Design a protein with these regions (language model features):
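Catalytic adenosine-cofactor/nucleotide-binding cores of aminoacyl-tRNA synthetases and other
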Residues: 1-54, 150-152
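Acidic, turn-prone loop/beta-hairpin segments
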Residues: 44-73, 102-188
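Short helix-adjacent coil turns
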Residues: 76-83
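Composition- and surface-driven signal marking solvent-exposed, interaction-prone regions
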Residues: 16-20, 87-88, 119, 147-148
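Core structural elements
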Residues: 5-6, 26-39, 56-68, 86-107, ...
Length: 188
């Protein structure tokens, strides 16, 4: 389903390629691995901290998530399922898994710190929102993962679709991260 949505550009015939299906299978594996990582860290205490007071990586991922929600919502309203699925793919694979999870691993090693508690909250909050965002495209996988996580309600279907949250928007964190990426690029 996700593969078909990603390939469904208006006015274009879909040429189903086995390589594309394999690529999105790998994406599904990435989601499962992110869920396993989350489950390893959910047993610790979490802290309810306002988004503006969270760490740099936490503010950055929440800002990227709310921007992705805005993009996906806009693309779905225009029936651009290809662009909506691409935005979800880019966020989950490249921002959440490749960058955010790698940035927070050192923080999560000290389980008792206030920083770790806040980061666990952001990790869980972001993943839960990602599953609701992904659900129309991958309903079976998102539901299966949802059932393994602590949650309220019987099903992910009963949860509201994510909306843009102004309190998560942090242009400052995004600019800092862009600068960090530029510096990293210069060093390589």
């Amino acid at each position: 389903r996700f593969t078909m949505a990603a390939m469904a550009s208006p006015g274009r015939d879909v040429k189903l390629a086995e390589e594309r299906i394999e690529g999105y299978r790998n994406f599904t594996n990435k989601i499962w691995n992110a869920a396993r990582f989350l489950l390893m860290h959910l047993d610790g205490e979490r802290a309810e901290v306002p988004a503006a007071q969270r760490s740099f990586p936490d503010r950055w991922i929440l800002s990227r998530l709310t921007a992705t929600i805005g993009t996906v919502t806009q693309e779905l309203e225009q029936y651009r399922f290809d662009r909506a699925s691409s935005a979800i793919y880019q966020f989950i694979w490249h921002e959440y898994c490749d960058k955010y999870i790698e940035m927070i691993k050192p923080t999560l090693k000290d389980q008792a710190s206030e920083q770790a508690k806040s980061t666990r909250q952001t990790l869980a909050e972001t993943f839960e929102t990602m599953m609701r965002l992904l659900h129309p495209f991958m309903p079976f996988i998102s539901e299966e993962i949802w059932q393994t996580l602590p949650h309220e309600g019987a099903s992910i279907v009963r949860k509201p679709y994510p909306t843009v949250r102004a309190d998560w928007d942090s242009q400052e964190a995004e600019q800092e991260f862009s600068l960090l990426e530029e510096c990293r690029g210069l060093m390589n």
